[in-house]
């Protein structure tokens, strides 16, 4: 799904994966990234929601929200797919138009009012200032034009980030890129891939840890002469 037109094999694999999660009674929240076709990704989203699979493909002028209850009360999950200033401005008058990615994200966040007495989680797919990237990968920021100041997310108890392939925390332990499950370039050969697990109890009591992934076929770098490698 690193493309707006994923292969039939990728679609079938995602379908099988979502079915397995549904059979385990796991709620799923999905958002579109910068490589995705948001309209295609969200096809049938209303039907999927009946199975607790919530897909947000496009920004529609307001943050999508899904609330789940546990023993500590409600957790509000806000979904913000990849946005550009133009995506936000189409819902604004010319006098209200925003400039820059930080302003665009900030405006999108202001479309909802958070209950600070309850737990709030946001899913976002943006390039946060200070992120460490793989320069050979597809997530390079050119000139910092699409950088977003991570402080715009300060009111959220956890910030689940996508876009960057390398797993890492930004600004605080509860703001994290989970990274990709597989390596997409040789620049990631020495990167340990993992799954990020968040243990969220009552408000303010959140623990974050990771479980390493071991691929069936790893990416390795071999340096030698052409003749010796052959």
What are these regions (language model features)?
Residues 2-31, 35-230:
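Extended recognition/assembly regions associated with phosphoester-bond processing machinery
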């Amino acid at each position: 799904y690193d493309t707006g037109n994923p292969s039939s094999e990728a679609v079938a694999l995602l379908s099988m994966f979502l079915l397995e999660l549904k059979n385990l009674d796991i709620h799923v929240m999905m958002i579109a990234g910068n490589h995705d076709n948001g309209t295609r990704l969200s096809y049938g989203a209303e039907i999927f929601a009946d199975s607790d699979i919530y897909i947000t493909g496009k920004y529609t002028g307001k943050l999508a929200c899904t609330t789940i209850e546990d023993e500590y009360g409600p957790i509000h999950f806000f979904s913000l797919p990849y946005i550009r200033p133009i995506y936000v401005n189409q819902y604004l008058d010319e006098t209200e138009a925003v400039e820059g990615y930080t302003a665009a994200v900030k405006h999108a966040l202001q479309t909802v009012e958070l209950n600070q007495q309850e737990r709030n989680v946001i899913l976002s797919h943006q390039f946060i200032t200070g992120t460490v990237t793989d320069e050979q990968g597809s997530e390079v920021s050119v000139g910092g034009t699409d950088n977003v100041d991570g402080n715009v997310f300060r009111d959220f108890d956890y910030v689940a980030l996508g876009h960057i392939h390398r797993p890492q925390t930004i600004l605080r332990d509860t703001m994290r890129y989970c990274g990709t499950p597989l390596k997409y370039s040789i620049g990631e050969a020495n990167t340990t891939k993992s799954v990020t697990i968040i243990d969220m109890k009552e408000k303010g009591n959140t623990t974050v840890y990771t479980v390493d992934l071991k691929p069936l076929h790893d990416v390795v770098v071999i340096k030698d002469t052409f003749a010796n490698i052959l």
